[in-house]
Amino acid sequence: MANDKIVIKGAREHNLKNVNLTLPREKFIVMTGLSGSGKSSLAFDTIYADGQRRYVESLSSYARMFLGRMDKPDVDEITGLSPAISIDQKTTSHNPRSTVGTVTEIYDYLRLLYARVGVPHCPVCGRVISQQSVDEMVDAVLKLEEGTKFQVLAPVVRQRKGTQQKELDAARRAGYARVKIDGNMYDLDEEIALEKNIKHTVEIVVDRLAMRRGIRGRLADSLETALALTGGVAEVDVIGGECMPFSQNFACPEHGISISDLSPRLFSFNNPLGACEKCTGLGTFMRVDEERILPNRDLSIREGAVKASGWYYAEGSVAEMYYLGLGKKYGFTLDTPIKEMSTEAVNALLYGTNEEKIEMHRTNEFGSGVYYNTFEGIVENLERRFRETNSEWMKEEIGSFMSGVECPDCHGKRLKPVVLAVTIGGKNISDFCEMSIRDELKFIADNEPNLTEKQKQIGGQIMKEIKNRLQFLQSVGLDYLTLARSAGTLSGGESQRIRLTTQIGSALSGVLYVLDEPSSGLHQRDNDKLIATLKNLRDLGNTVIVVEHDEDTMRSADYIVDVGPGAGVHGGEIVAAGSVKDICKAKRSITGDYLSGRKRIEVPQTRRPGNGNFLTVKGARENNLRNIDVKFPLGEFVCVTGISGSGKSSLINEILYKTLACELNGARSRAGKCDGVEGLEFVDKVIGIDQQPIGRTPRSNPATYTGVFNDIRTVFSQTQDAKMRGYGPGRFSFNVRGGRCEACEGNGILQIEMHFLPDVYVPCEVCKGARYNRETLEVKYKEKTISDVLNMTVEEAVVFFANQPKIARKLQTLLDVGLGYVTLGQSATTLSGGEAQRVKLANELARRSTGKTVYILDEPTTGLHMADVHRLIEVLQKLVDAGNTVIVIEHNLDLIKCADHIIDLGPEGGSAGGLIVAEGTPEQVAEVSGSFTGQYLKPLLEKDAKLRAEGK
């Protein structure tokens, strides 16, 4: 029988309840269900994990050492599995060297293209560089001063891993005496042992000379020998001076600038051969930002103008002593506003007095005295401390005053001038990468016909690969991105779709792909392209499993699995599986309720008019925003929409949020480019709620994050038993000595390392997983220990603490945002992005509202089922009903249609975006023909109006 099915038996990972399921192979399958229902546990932690584990275990133990160890999922049996590839939203690289180009591997093809087809120019005069003869090389060397000592080198190995014994033995046999390896000189008579896994540069010393008359012949012979050894490359190493590289291939006759052989490595900013020497290929430096040190120049030093670690003003401090000395020298007092100080004085304050000394008066218990000392400046002081400290806390503290500044040598282009002087069609590799993907495709189409026959023959296949990958990126709605864009700045959805294009480009078949909500961050207009891409992946002969909540994706799937019926302990079952029709018919399926129309998110009957006040961003110019003025009505539910890359995040996260955070919350972040934000007097604080984890260690959990655990510990410390034993709230903390189990240090589990097998996590034998020692667990509140409370779900805890109003109120907010299934002690590292965001939202809801707060949320519906979106909308509407303002970046039409006010940016992404296309109520935006959001919103509003008219 053909193995055309994936059969899962007895899946019990996390909350799955002994699930049995049969899935068709080589089909497009959607797994859906409420947040926390067990979709990801089934798709990622069971199916993918077992497929990946089996593949890895088929490799040798040596190979497995480099691939990491994989846990075996809690499942009886899975048959019909293929090697599995996971494309989730959690693997965005924060490495500053990682870019869209490197992640998609397009940059590798570009390096190859520029090395083979690129035209080298002199970086000084721009002249096309031609071949260099031996005579020209000799002439360049003979310009050295009389008596200058130098040696002629033959670089036989450049930045290559290995012991290089083959080359060293060949040099010995040829009769050479010396060799230069990684900048150090060696005699070939001695034993030379090089580290195998480190890159080395090996240069044979062909001749050693001193500049004098009559050496032309010998020099020419030596250069020819070196060129013969290396295939056309030689170096003249001037003792005590710079190295002079020569090539028979490329050199400028006027300026004598030589380029070593054009190889793909030369175009890599991760390789010392091509990377800018000043910034080592990063393109930026982290420097202390003076705007973060002096954020408000209307203030004086005494009023706290200086906001820098170690330099806050305090009477009698060392900082005051320096400030008084600077004031005496540069003519200001501690009460002079910074803006009224001379430029010279501000520069001295920030960057020091160089060698000039200032007079300082110091008084202490031993008396007073006068000192004369130089002042290094606050900026220089912070940067020195940042370099020298071993304290992670200090690095983080000073790091908050720093921001990236463009490298002055390469101007952010990451490469050496000689590399940037190699062009195709008048553009160097960096220029090409800084264009948007749509412009790159146009550039290739315009310039391909202009290539010579030889260039076409050499670069034809390379250009085809580049075009294919760029077209894949365009097909998933990412044509506004540039290849130079840092991977760390991408959203989860963007990052996932980029890796998706890499997989399609590899054209594998017979693979199991598991994707996590690929429609995240994607405008409805581009969704059809994404679905077509997923079907293309299926048509290559792969099984595509997608964890998704998007209705269009579900309706396009070959097979749907609905996991539920509820979340957490109420989920973990297969409620329905089959076609869309099968799901709609299933009575227990909440997904079916929404797909069939039995339930729906209704459009509000009225839109709020707001309180008449506005926050106005003037002249927004960050990234692709085109000097726009944007008005945000206060006291309303505001939704910012637009095509991916249209400028939503630049406007809201970079400009509005950071400005409000600095002005209202005293944050150190630097806002994006604009002329200012008006209306700050109408709000008193801003709260940004994103999907970043609430903690990075297993010790962080919803109870500790929301602060409810402090109140719970206080309740336990007030019990009769605790008072008799003298236990305070600290006794009930699992993070400090005293009450916790010391065998596992309050973790409850022990990690046992198993070489070449997955690490085993076993419950602590002493506390049996309870986290606390026996004495602490003897204290009970209502017959429950502190450990029992941590194992309660939020739902159970609300009932348990009903007579503790302070605790009950905080827990109720967690319940209100749909997290009733989460346990109080659940590790923060196991929460999804959507769950983490809702914990943060609950934390803010629990605070007393002032009615003048601005809440900013970036795509809060990511990871949420339609029923969860329904509940989220109700929570956000409550915030606005209390007089607050909610501003949301969103693509989900069900949420957008419930907003009071929409600001639609566009019309396209990247350079074709950055304008306001439409604004107003959803009904007003739906009538704007140029708005893509309006086009998709209109039928939705009409359908709702029709149902309302029919009384449904």
PLM ranges: what are they?
Residues 1-952:
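Conserved phosphate-binding elements of NTP-dependent enzyme cores
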